[in-house]
Amino acid sequence: MTTKNLLVELFVEELPPKALKKLGDAFAGVLAEQLKALGLATAESVVTAYASPRRLAAHISHVWLKADDKAVQQKLMPVSVGLDSAGHATPALLKRLQALGADLSDPVAAVAALKRAPDGKAEALFYNSLVTGATLDTGLQKALEEAIAKLPIPKVMSYQLETDCELPGWTSVNFVRPAHGLVALHGSTVVPVKVLGLKAGNSTRGHRFEAAVDPVVLADADSYAVTLEIDGAVIASFAQRKAEIARQLAEAAAELGGGVQPIEDDALLDEVTALVERPNVLVCEFEKEFLDVPQECLILTMKANQKYFPLLDAAGKLTNKFLVVSNISPEDASFVIGGNERVVRPRLADAKFFFDQDRKRTLASRVEGLGKVVYHNKLGTQGERTERVAEIAVKIAQLLEGDALAGKAGKAAWLAKADLLTDMVGEFPELQGTMGRYYALHDGHSAEIAAAIEDHYKPRFAGDELPRNPVGVVVALADKLETLVGMFGIGNLPTGDKDPFALRRHALGVIRMLVEKDLPLDLGALVGGAAPVFGDKITDATPALLDFIYDRLSGSLREQGYSAQEVDSVVSQKPQRLGDVPKRLAAVRAFAALPEAPALAAANKRIGNILKKEALEVDPHVSELLLREAAEIALYAAMRDVVPTANAQFDTGDYTASLQTLAALRAPVDAFFDGVMVNAEELDLRLNRQGLLKSLHNAMNRVADLSRLVA
C-alpha cells in the first residue's frame, strides 16, 4: 500500500479579509495535526495551506488510505483485585475485559492470555490487544470536524442549508460564513466525508465572474492549484496571490516613471490579498488641488477606507496617482478606473474640508475645551491631564537644560492635546499629533514646538522612531510618565494580556528614550517627581511602578540578545541612570570572558550568603590592627591597591575597565577563603572580617551583581 496526496477544500461565501490568512493556516494546520495523530499522515507529509476570499483548502502529501494497526498494552487492575485466591477471574476483571471487547467464550483462556508484571509495589494485570488503524474515511471525517471547530473565529453566523443539501431547512448550522461546497480527494478518489451539511465531491467553483468553466472539476489532489487558476481564474495560494499583487504594483509604478513607488504597507497588502481571487492592478488619479491637504490625511483615507495604494515620488511626497487592486480584468478597464476615481473624490473632499475648517481656529483657542473632555473618571479631564503633563515636562526640562528648554517644553505640552478637538482628528484618530504639528505651524509656532507636538506620542510601537528634538523627548517622557504614574496610582494595572491604557508600551517608551538618548536623568527621581502633580487623586505607587519598569527593561534586554544572567546581574542593581545600562552589560560580558570571572562570581555569591545571615547590617569598616591571618592581610592590601582604581574608573563611566581591574583580586580572595575563618569566635575578629567582606562586596557589585553570573 502506497501513500497518496490529499486535498480538502471548503467553498464558502466571502470570508473576513483581516482574518483570512489566519483561518487558512489554522484550517490546514489542524487537519494535518489530526491526520498525523491518527497515523494517516506521515513525518514526510508536507502541508500547503490555501486561502482565498471564497475558500479554505489544504494539500497534504503522503497520506495513507489506512493507518497501521497498533499493538496496545493496557493496565487493567492489581492482581489482588482481578483474581481470587484460586486464580480465577473476579467479576470486576470480567466486566473490564468485556468492556474492552475481549473474547470471553473461554474465561480461563482469556485470563491466561493476560500479562502479569510488577507495577510499583504491587503486581498488576495487563491486556494486550491489536487496535485497528483508522481508515481515511473515518479519520478525515474526525479531522475535518476538529479543524472547523478549532478555527479562530470570533463570531459565527447561523444560516439555513440549501435545499439540495442533506437535511434541507436545518437552521442550526454555525460557521464564519455560509458554506456551499466541499472537496475531498485522495489522489483522484473522492473521500466520502460530510460537514456543515455538505457531501464531499471533486468539483469546486472558480472566480465569481471570470471562471472559464463552472463548476471546476478537479482530476486529482495535485491538480488543484493549477486547475483552479486555469479553469477557475483563481490564484488559491495566499502567498502567491500576495506576491503577484506586489509584482503588479511595482510594474505599474515603473511604467509611470519618474521614480514613483507605491507606499509600503504589509498589512494593507495582506488585506487586499484577502479581498481578491485574481488581482488586476489599475492606475487611477485624483485632482492635484487635493495635494494641498497634508499627505498623511490623504494617504490614510485612501488606505483605510478604500484599500488603495497611494503613489509617492522619489522624494517621498504624495502624487495625485494611486493604484487599485481590482478583482476583475475587463478588456476595457476605463469603467473600473473611473468608478474608483469617483469613489475616492468625496473622501478627499471631506479631508480638505476638515483641514480648511480646522485652520479657522488656533490650537491655543482649543485648549480650554479639553476641560470638557473626560480622560478618566478618577483622573479628571484632558484639560487637567494637559496641566499635569506640562508641569512634569517643565520639571524634566529644568533637570536637563534649564529655563530655555523648560519654556519650550511647557508650551509644547500645553498645546499637545489640542488637536483632539479638531474635525480631522475626530474623523481620523490615527492622525492625533500629526495634525497638531500642521496646525501649530499654521498658527506661527516654531518648527521645534510643532515637531514636539507630533512626536510626544512616540515611540508608538516596537521599533518606532524616537522624538526628533529635545523638546519632543521631554514632552514624550512627561506624557508617558503622567499615564504610568496616574494609572498605577489608582490601581489600574495591566493584567495578563489586558492592557487597555498601553502601560507596557509607555514603560518601554520611557526606557528607550532614557537609554537611546543617554539622558542624565535618574529613573526614581522622574517617577517620584511626577507623583505630586496629581495631588490627592492618586496613591503614591512609585515602588510598584519602578518594579514594573525594571521588569519591562529586563524583557527588552533579553529580546535584544543578552543572556538572562547578564540582564539579571545588571537590572537587579536597579541602576538609576538607564542610559548606563548598555555600558554595564558590555562590561559584564567582557568580565564574564575573563578566566578569573567564574571564581570571583562564585566568591561574590558566597560573600553575599555570609552577609545575609547577619541579623544587622554589616559595617564595611576594617581595622588593620585586627587583621591577624596572612591571607586577610594580603586581601586587604590588594583591595587598597585595586579598589580605588576600580572606583575611579567606575566614576568616569568606564565600567569595563573597572571590572577588569577588580579581576586582579581573584588570587587573594581565593586565598582568604582557603585560609581564614570568617566567623571567628572572637567578636571583634568576626566583625572585622565581615567588614572586610562587606567592603569587598560593595566594590565588586557597583557595576552589576556578579553573583548572578554563577550558573
Curated annotation (Swiss-Prot):
It is found in: Cytoplasm. It catalyses: tRNA(Gly) + glycine + ATP = glycyl-tRNA(Gly) + AMP + diphosphate. Its EC number is 6.1.1.14. InterPro entries: DALR_anticod-bd (IPR008909), Gly-tRNA-synth_bsu (IPR015944), Gly-tRNA-synth_heterodimer (IPR006194). GO terms for molecular function: arginine-tRNA ligase activity; ATP binding; glycine-tRNA ligase activity. It is an enzyme of class 6 (ligase). GO terms for cellular component: cytosol. The keyword ATP-binding applies. PROSITE patterns: AA_TRNA_LIGASE_II_GLYAB. Belongs to the class-II aminoacyl-tRNA synthetase family. This is Glycine--tRNA ligase beta subunit. The lineage of its organism: Bacteria, Pseudomonadati, Pseudomonadota, Betaproteobacteria, Burkholderiales.
